Amino acid sequence: MTRWRPAAVLFDRDGTLVRDVPYNDDPALVEPVPGAREALDRLRAAGVPIGVVTNQSGVAAGLIRPDRLRAVNARVEELLGPFDVWRVCPHGERDGCACRKPRPGLVRQAARALGVPPGECVVIGDIGRDVEAARAAGARGILVPTPQTLPEEIAAAAEVAADLAEAVALACRPDARPPRVAGGRGTGRGSRIGRTPR
């Protein structure tokens, strides 16, 4: 019997794969979260395509130059290995684009680039808009909370994992639903005050 696997797993960048540094334009500040490389390598070994879907509103705000964004993303790949697709929304909150999470555009674009149906993808992220974008695209969303994750985002998530290793294991086991972990890598007590828009 063939083991089920997702058509692709798409990750948020900041706060999920690497430490969240607000409006980071410095590759030297890129720091993977614990276990990120191992979780990604597990998917690579299984032949599952992986990608990044990330909001980068600092570009629209003039805080991140496009070339610096590319340099930061290149550093992410240097530390975590290659991704099969990157999709970045450079727009601001009020720009009205279709790609900015929680809208489904980034997820749909990434799935299209990989040649897979969005409904067979899994999206892993650390805040509500990541799993909301997954839901809007018809994909499966898994939340990995950090201190920036709001309690209501945890409560609203259909699936919650303590860390990336658990999220990847859950992504590859659609029939298994382990107990929800309130907090994960954080306390789940994040506040809107001080949370930098992405």
Language model features with spans:
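Structural recognition of alpha->loop->beta junctions
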Residues: 72-88, 152-173
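Acidic, Mg2+-coordinating phosphoryl-transfer loop and its flanking beta/alpha structural elements
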Residues: 122-159
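Active-site neighborhood of HAD-like aspartate-dependent phosphohydrolases
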Residues: 1-51
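Conserved Lys-Pro-Asp/Glu-containing loop-to-beta segment of HAD-superfamily phosphomonoesterases
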Residues: 98-128
